[in-house]
Amino acid sequence: MGSTRRRSVSLYHASGCHLCESARRVLASVQRETPFDLREIDIGGDRELEARYREWLPVVEIDGERAFVYYVDPDAFRRKAQSQSSA
């Protein structure tokens, strides 16, 4: 039986993005009850990241896989964050 590890969550955002602020609040709320590692990446000023993510913000990736764009549903995110991966 394998051990479990915490999910790694990345939030790609930009300054002044109201949807990004909403996503940040959802992640913070779920993180209080379900621990996961959160990395916030501001795409501003990085041409490669802007080209890749600008049209989709906010973008949430879980363990390197795109899970949400535009809107983060709290219940759906909670389910994904709670389903542990085998290490």
Model-assigned labels for residue ranges:
Residues 2-29:
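Local sequence-structure signature of Cys/Sec-based thiol-disulfide redox active-site neighborhoods
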Residues 21-25, 51-55, 72:
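Generic recognition of short, well-ordered alpha-helical segments
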Residues 31-35:
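Short helix-capping segments at alpha-helix termini
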Residues 36-47:
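Thiol-based oxidoreductase modules, predominantly thioredoxin-like and allied folds used
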Residues 45-59:
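Short Fe-S-cluster ligation motifs
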Residues 58-66:
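A short, hydrophobic beta-strand/beta-hairpin element that forms part of a small beta-sheet core
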Residues 65-87:
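Non-catalytic, surface beta->alpha helical segment in thiol-disulfide oxidoreductase systems
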